[in-house]
Amino acid sequence: MSDNLYKKVVAKNRRASFDYSIEENIEAGIILTGSELKSIREGKVSLADSHAAESAGELYLYNCHIAEYEKANRFNHAPLRPRKLLVHKREMQKIIGKIKLKGYTLIALSLYFNHKNKIKIELGLARGKKQYDKRESIKEDDWKREQGRILRDKK
């Protein structure tokens, strides 16, 4: 397997593609404490309802729940604290410009270890779907599944 393609996914936001139409994917680093890192290695992280927003010219990840590390002492972390994201300056300015447009949100899609064993987060620049859009995507998925069954049965 190529080094560039290696990803060990720790957490995934499964509802993201159902609730949002994702237009662009962005990879970012994330600043963590030691107890957060150990908790992520154990898989105790949830990306449900997590999103990124701009604060004082920086990007921060909000509502990402990383459980407290059981073996940590009194210096344990707060599970829902805002976490700073690491993105190149030009890319950050481009993202912030798009976020300020009406209807765009930066949501967390997945959290993973890259080939250098660094934790990265995949963010999606997305627009929220209306209820009728969600029903339409369910119909499309059902039809694609049905087509697969029909083609498989003919062979």
PLM regions and their residue ranges:
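C-terminal low-complexity, charged extensions that often adopt amphipathic alpha-helices
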Residues: 105-110, 148-155
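Intrinsically disordered, low-complexity regulatory segments
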Residues: 1-6, 10, 139
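Beta-rich strand-turn-strand
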Residues: 87-124, 128-130
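Short small-residue beta-strand/loop micro-motif enriched in glycine and branched aliphatics
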Residues: 73-75, 130-133
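Flexible glycine-rich active-site/ligand-binding loops centered on an Asp-His dyad
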Residues: 126, 134-151
